[in-house]
């Protein structure tokens, strides 16, 4: 059985996620620019879907990188 470290959600239950809020979106991206799973970030299903859409939209608009160049 795999145990995941529970992270505290950075969002309140009714808070919406906006693609323009880059600082918030960066909290849910790994150093390899992958979106953190819902299991490990503590978001609800609805919030995770909003988060994924916002991150993808921010990447297309060049607000976030697709891949980090480290």
From Swiss-Prot:
One GO-annotated biological process of the protein: translation
Pfam family, one: Ribosomal_S18
One GO CC annotation: ribonucleoprotein complex
Keyword tags: Chloroplast, Plastid, Ribonucleoprotein, Ribosomal protein, RNA-binding, rRNA-binding
Entry GO MF terms: small ribosomal subunit rRNA binding; structural constituent of ribosome
UniProt entry tagged with the keyword Membrane: no
Record's subcellular location: Plastid, Chloroplast
Family matches, as Gene3D superfamilies: Ribosomal protein S18
Domain of life of the organism encoding this protein: Eukaryota
The protein's assembly and partners: Part of the 30S ribosomal subunit.
UniProt family annotation: Belongs to the bacterial ribosomal protein bS18 family.
Designated name of the protein: Small ribosomal subunit protein bS18c
Organism field: Gracilaria tenuistipitata var. liui
